[in-house]
């Protein structure tokens, strides 16, 4: 398995473009999966510079509906064949906002403080573009290609990983409520070395999500994690607990990035031996050896 980061906040090599977003190109056998598409079009230009032909993409998956993860698809769509499978999760078209007051929701003041963050397109847009392969999934776990899975329907995180109160969504009655990110999904690749997990932002809590992955693949060890862990706005205690989780796990590569935030990245760099600096241009492949251990370290 090979992955290439096409779009991220940071760049690892001169000549590539950064943006606040995330896009990862995954190669596994004959599968060419684009996991998220960034905010604008950095993933397109970076792919060209990295020698990746996005017209060869065999499937697309969106981690959630925020524009920094699927906004770039508005420019990418014309490159793809109309029947390419495109996977979102149920709830993808629920409108989302960020409340800049960073306070618990107060309905009467929303209109003055909210920024619309997703989705950047409506359901009709896919059909107007002739993209007949678009699907909204409702599965806990679905295999979309050999060894490649999408997982959704995560349990609500505990109080230590609660969704930030500034994340709100449109409720069933049209009123705004705390966002539960029902559309969030992660990609899991089952390799001989263990499970490789790709996250978008892990709004439902990175520890909670990885624990769910372990429960759904009970015989397989976690080997690597790439993507956002949503440790912003920074909470030093939450960051420390998250770093401890990774440090005491058997995860051999922690390519946390994007919404992990500057403080989170610094703590990971200082305390997690498995941490791998991740940005646009990163190319990573699974090692050839197989791992048999599973679970977590005792200390």
Name each model feature, range by range.
Residues 31-33, 59, 148, 194-196, ...:
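Structural motif
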Residues 42-93, 217-224, 250-253:
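Active-site metal-binding motif and surrounding structural segment of the metallo-beta-lactamase
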Residues 93-185, 277-287:
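Metallo-beta-lactamase
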């Amino acid at each position: 398995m090979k992955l290439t980061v096409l779009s991220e906040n940071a760049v690892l090599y001169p000549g590539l473009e950064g943006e606040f977003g995330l896009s990862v190109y995954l190669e596994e056998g004959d599968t060419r999966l684009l996991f998220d598409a960034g905010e604008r079009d950095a993933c397109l230009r970076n792919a060209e510079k990295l020698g990746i032909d996005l017209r060869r993409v065999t499937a697309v998956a969106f981690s959630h509906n925020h524009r920094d993860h699927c906004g770039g698809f508005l420019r990418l769509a014309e490159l793809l064949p109309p029947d390419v499978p495109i996977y979102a999760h149920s709830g993808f078209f629920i409108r989302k906002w960020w409340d800049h007051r960073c306070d618990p929701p107060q309905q009467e003041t929303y209109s003055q403080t909210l920024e619309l963050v997703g989705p950047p397109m409506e359901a009709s847009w896919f059909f107007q573009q002739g993209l007949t392969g678009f699907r909204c999934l409702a599965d806990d776990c679905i295999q979309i290609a050999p060894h490649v899975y999408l997982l959704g329907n995560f349990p609500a995180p505990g109080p230590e990983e609660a969704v930030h109160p500034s994340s709100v969504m449109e409720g069933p009655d049209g009123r705004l409520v705390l966002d539960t990110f029902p559309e969030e999904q992660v990609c899991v690749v089952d390799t001989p070395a263990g499970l490789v997990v790709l996250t978008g932002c892990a709004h439902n809590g990175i520890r909670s999500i990885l624990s769910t992955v372990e429960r759904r693949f009970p015989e397989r060890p976690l080997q690597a994690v790439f993507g956002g862990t949503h440790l912003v706005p920074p909470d030093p205690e939450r960051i420390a607990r998250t770093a401890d989780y990774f440090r005491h796990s058997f995860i051999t590569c922690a390519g946390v990035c994007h919404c992990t935030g500057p403080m989170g990245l610094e703590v990971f760099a200082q305390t997690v031996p498995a941490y791998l600096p991740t940005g646009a241009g990163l190319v990573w492949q699974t090692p050839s050896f197989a791992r048999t251990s599973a679970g977590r370290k005792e200390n």
